[in-house]
Amino acid sequence: YYNTCFAIRSGEEYFMTDAGGGNGILRILEEMQVPLNRIHHLFVTHEHTDHILGVIWMIRMIGTAIKKGNYEGIFHIYCHDGLIDTIQTFCRLTLQKKFCDLIGDPIQLIPISDRETRQILDMEVTFFDIHSTKARQFGFRAVLPDGKIVCCPGDEPLNPLCEEFAKGADWLFHEAFCLYRDREIF
């Protein structure tokens, strides 16, 4: 766990959430002994720099591994449809063409929508719009194989419209720690 970046392991594979604000995520993953070639699913909550800039480093490093034959399969990046162009633009402006050319296949940017449920690894993951007034942002609720529930409702106070996703969660990964009604105070 790093800021609001975290990875859930299932067997030898990982589902990662956000990637931090730069290449520091690479050091954190190394320290946590999370191999890049085992991360095949990444969810990006929103466009703020402390959540999205590390995605570019992930694409670069996983792209390098793909080019060297050290990464098998597809790298799935899930985000709301508005972030797809943002990520592609960042990549186009900062990465070599050989990495940008991997976007589409084997690096896939996958748009998700409010209340959409997907099977990711061995988890049932439901994405939801957190109803942010600052920047469009999504969270998720995942049911793990053992029935435990993980909820990541983003980095703003939990909007009452999203309570159903957090209710009953065994693990709640949240960056904001105040009630929605108190958001202007904090």
Regions found by a protein language model. Name each.
Residues 17-20, 40-46, 54, 80, ...:
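Active-site neighborhood of phospho(di)ester-bond hydrolases with catalytic His/Asp-centered motifs
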Residues 110-168:
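Catalytic core of the metallo-beta-lactamase
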Residues 157-186:
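Cap/insert and terminal regions of metallo-dependent hydrolase folds
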Residues 26-27, 53, 85-88, 160:
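Alpha-helical elements of the RecA-like P-loop NTPase motor core of helicases
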Residues 1-32, 136-154, 171:
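Conserved beta-strand hairpin/beta-sheet module of binuclear metal-dependent hydrolase folds
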Residues 71-136:
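Metallo-beta-lactamase
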Residues 23-76:
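Active-site metal-binding motif and surrounding structural segment of the metallo-beta-lactamase
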Residues 21, 49, 132, 157-158, ...:
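Short, glycine/acidic-enriched loop or turn micro-motifs at the edges of active sites
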